[in-house]
Amino acid sequence: MRAYHDLLRRILDDGVAKHDRTGTGTLSVFGHQMRFDLAEGFPLVTTKRLHLKSIIHELLWFLAGDTNVAYLQSNGVTIWDEWADEHGDLGPVYGRQWRSWAKPDGGSVDQIAWVLDEIRRNPDSRRLVVSAWNPADLDRMALAPCHCLFQFYIAERRLSCQLYQRSADAFLGVPFNIASYALLTAMMAHVLDLEPGDFVHTLGDAHLYSNHVAQARQQLARDERPLPRLRLNPEVRSLFDFRYDDVVIEGYDPHPAIRAPVAV
């Protein structure tokens, strides 16, 4: 995970102080890219413990097209609670855009199903793109998409994914995002009978909140540990049939968690 630690160092060394929507203040850099070869291990940060249940359940929730926190809460995941309304709704956020992008004629587009089918039909396509950034729906979203567009690429029977993230909370959010999209790539490769390739993470505004700087320095003082391995249930043949118990992370031995406040 050296690429992630290099991001933290770059922000600490070169970041510019900026104001932000939350009023917390950040150190920020613009334009940064990381690359993770998924054959080398599952890219989970080891210099602090991540909450695996949240990562896995959130991705399954996205893939189900769900935009209410009830499923997450029933599985002990609270990462979206701060943005939900009194009914648990978040508006047309990620799951809605991924699975049911509204069309002008009243219909909808299932972008995930489409990209799976298109990979099977035309693996060399340069249109293997899924977008969560729908300007017509932004005002109705509890939180505008931070990780807003991703593209797949197939070469030598390896499936790679590149994510563009417009806004990247480097301490709390980015480790989750890396793991989530690495997991999505591996799950898609599994059902497509491909091997996982690279996960490429391209960041726009990459920032450390002012109240995360000390925690980032603490994390960088720790030694990295070997990456864990991902094991998926071989009996699952549809992306939409995965359940929590079908995803197993083996050999995850991180340093203790480092607490930091969420900027809302």
UniProtKB/Swiss-Prot annotation:
Pfam families (alphabetical): Thymidylat_synt
GO cellular component annotations of the record: cytosol
Domain of life: Bacteria
Coiled coil: none
Organism, as annotated: Methylobacterium nodulans (strain LMG 21967 / CNCM I-2342 / ORS 2060)
Known EC number: 2.1.1.45
Cellular compartment(s): Cytoplasm
Keyword Coiled coil carried by entry: no
EC category: transferase
Catalysed conversion reaction: dUMP + (6R)-5,10-methylene-5,6,7,8-tetrahydrofolate = 7,8-dihydrofolate + dTMP
Keywords in alphabetical order: Cytoplasm, Methyltransferase, Nucleotide biosynthesis, Transferase
Entry's Gene Ontology molecular function annotations: thymidylate synthase activity
One BP annotation, GO: dTTP biosynthetic process
Matching InterPro entries: Thymidate_synth/dCMP_Mease, Thymidate_synth/dCMP_Mease_dom, Thymidate_synth/dCMP_Mease_sf, Thymidylate_synthase
Annotated residues for binding of dUMP: R21, R126, R127, R166, S167, A168, D169, N177, H207, L208, Y209
Function recorded in the entry: Catalyzes the reductive methylation of 2'-deoxyuridine-5'-monophosphate (dUMP) to 2'-deoxythymidine-5'-monophosphate (dTMP) while utilizing 5,10-methylenetetrahydrofolate (mTHF) as the methyl donor and reductant in the reaction, yielding dihydrofolate (DHF) as a by-product. This enzymatic reaction provides an intracellular de novo source of dTMP, an essential precursor for DNA biosynthesis.
Catalytic residues identified in the record: C146
Name by which UniProt lists this protein: Thymidylate synthase
Pathway assignment: Pyrimidine metabolism; dTTP biosynthesis
